[in-house]
Every structure is written in C-alpha cells, then in structure tokens.
A protein has these predicted regions:
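A non-catalytic alpha/beta surface segment that caps or lines the substrate-entry region
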Residues: 40, 54-109, 258-260
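N-terminal capping segment at the start of a domain
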Residues: 23-70, 85, 125, 293-303
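Proline/glycine-enriched tight loop/beta-turn segments at coil->beta junctions
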Residues: 110-117
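Extracytoplasmic/secreted proteins, especially bacterial periplasmic and envelope-associated proteins
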Residues: 48-51, 55, 73-89, 138, ...
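Acidic/histidine-rich catalytic neighborhood of metal-dependent amide-processing enzymes
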Residues: 127-237, 266-269
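Active-site-adjacent substrate-binding region
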Residues: 43, 207-327
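Second-shell loop/turn segments in exported
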Residues: 35-43, 60-69, 92-94, 126-136, ...
Length: 327
C-alpha cells in the first residue's frame, strides 16, 4: 500500500510539474476592446481579402498538379497581384513529378541594406480537387494584404514574401514541396535569419461551445473549446517568435489569440510550410485557425469562399501587421 501511495504521489507531482512547465510555454492573450479600428481601412482590406479568396477558390478553383492548368492560372494571378501592389515577382521554378511548378516571391530589403531575414508565406495550392478557400486561399489573401500595407514601410529586416507551391499531398514533406525548396534557398544565402511565419488556414471561426478540438486530450485542459481564436504554433526552439507574435496580436488586434509551443515530434503541428524551416534549424511558426480541428469543410468540396469570416481574417491581418511593423 505504501508503494502505491508513493507511486501516486510521485505521479501527481510529475503531472503538476508538467502542467506548470507547459503553462510557461503557453502565450495566451486576452482579447482587447480598446483598440481603435479605422473603418475605411478595414473596409478596404476586407474587400481585398474577399476579392483574392474568390478569385483563387471560386473562379480558379482546385489548384494542384492534379488540376495543373488551374495551378498555372493561380500562379499567373499571383504574379499579377504582386506587380499591382508594387513588387517585382520572382519565380523559383523546378520540376515536381513531371510538372513545372513555381514558388512566387518578392523581397523587401531592409532600410539599412543589411539585417536579418524574415520569411512570411502561404501556400497557394489546394488539396486535389477541392476549392481550398480556407486551405489556403485565406492565407494567401492575408499575405497580399500585408504586402500592400508594408510596401512603403521602413523596416530594419529583410522581408521575403512567398506564395509556396505544393504544400499538399502528394508533395508535402518531400523535396517537391515549395517550402522545402525555399528553406534550402534561404539557408544557402548564409545570412542571419530571424524566422519564418506560415499563414495556414486563417479564415474559419466558430464561437459555439465544443466547436474546437485538439490532437491530444491534455490540450483540451489548457485551451478553449470554442473555435473563435487564432493560434500561433511553434516548436520549442521557436518560443521567442511565438511569444513576440502573440504579444503583437494583443497590442494590434482584438482577436482572441493562443500561442502554443509544442515538441516538434507532434505530427499535427508540422503539417505546413513552416516545417521545412524547422528542419533547417530556423525559428518558424504557423498562424492558423487549426484547420480540421475546427473546420468541417477542410479538404472537402465545401471549402468555399462564403464559409469564411472576413472580419476575423482582417483581425489576423492586423495582428501580423502589428508584428511586422515592429521589425
């Protein structure tokens, strides 16, 4: 009996220590109601978000090597949008399973001519035959809005804006993945890298109780059960970047924000364009609505533009813009 009691005591202490440790890696921000919102700016940004999502997920539709012509149409559209905003689009082109595919990127140099590199990107392909409004026209639309906002800004870091190709299967977690190629490119520059931000499915929100799920039960004890927040997710090495971005949301956006630092071996936190940057040793985070852990339209034909919450997407834009404006 004494051994059982000792075992339970040690187990209880260990569990308490784990939760205390993990709580120190959780960066929660209480939503603020005192942040002024420029109605003219919000209207213009929301209009742009809707336009870009509708073009990618509505007019073009499924964008993958399975629907190769649509993938090319999406690439052409994004190159045009880069130019309209005032950036010269560059292509990182390569062969993937018999198809010529391209990352589309633009570099905003620092005001000093040197400084660290920050990569911010979103994948523009969709899964097989699905329209991919949330996954991931939403992320691309927010990226384009950020590019427009920061065009004339004076920043101390070099910002790489990237639309990645081939995030989805059968290319993910392989050299055919666009982010894999770009992470390699950045590592070969031999320059200091501040980190990478992946905008991955950022447009679906649900305030109903029980609408949010998690890959592990223990996370349910620490995070909300309503899918009305944006998550900033990183591995242990990326805790500083997670903290900085979460804090920027607190000062720039009224949107509920949850920062999570988790071990890299958890498969569900490594399912997007940030993962190849982790493998290169860089800090990287995924800003996400958590996709299939909230959105029943994930990887379905129902992932349409009219299922997204553009007001909250605007708040995602505000939070990331707030972070980038500090660089």
């Amino acid at each position: 009996m004494k051994k059982v009691i000792l075992f339970l005591f040690i187990g209880g202490i260990s569990l308490a220590a784990f939760f205390a440790w993990y709580s120190s890696l959780r960066f929660k921000q209480t939503p603020r109601t005192d942040i002024p919102i420029d109605s003219a700016e919000s209207s213009a940004v929301i209009s742009g978000l809707k336009k870009d999502v509708l073009e990618l997920a509505g007019n073009i539709g499924a964008r993958s090597t399975t629907h190769y012509q649509n993938l090319l149409a999406a690439s052409k559209y994004l190159q045009t949008r880069f130019a309209e905003i005032g950036y010269e689009p560059s292509l990182q082109t390569y062969q993937a399973k018999g198809h010529e595919v391209s990352n589309i990127y633009a570099i905003k140099p620092s005001s000093t001519g040197d400084g660290e590199v920050l990569v911010i990107g979103a994948h523009y392909d969709s899964q097989y035959s699905n329209p991919g409004a949330d996954d991931n026209a939403s992320g691309v639309a927010v990226l384009l809005a950020l590019m427009k906002s920061l065009k004339s800004a004076s920043l101390k870091r070099n910002i790489h804006f990237v639309c990645f190709v081939n995030e989805e299967l059968p290319h993910s977690h392989s050299p055919d993945m666009g982010a894999w190629r770009y992470a390699k490119f950045v590592s070969e520059l031999k320059v200091p890298v501040l980190g990478m931000i992946s905008l991955e499915s950022v447009g679906y929100f649900d305030s109903a109780k029980g609408s949010q799920r998690y890959p592990f039960k223990f996370l349910e004890l620490m995070y909300p059960d309503s899918g009305d927040f944006i998550a900033v997710v990183g591995n242990l090495k990326s805790h500083t970047l997670v903290s900085s971005i979460t804090e920027a949301f607190h000062t720039s956006s009224p949107l509920k924000t949850e920062g999570a630092v988790l071990p890299q071996f958890i498969r569900d936190i490594a399912r997007s364009d940030h993962a190849p940057f982790w493998k290169r040793g860089f800090q990287a985070v995924m800003v996400t609505d958590t996709a299939n852990f909230r959105n029943a339209n994930y990887h379905q034909p129902t992932d349409h533009p009219n299922t997204l919450d553009y007001e909250r997407m605007y708040q995602v834009y505000r939070g990331i813009n707030g972070y980038l404006s500090t660089l």
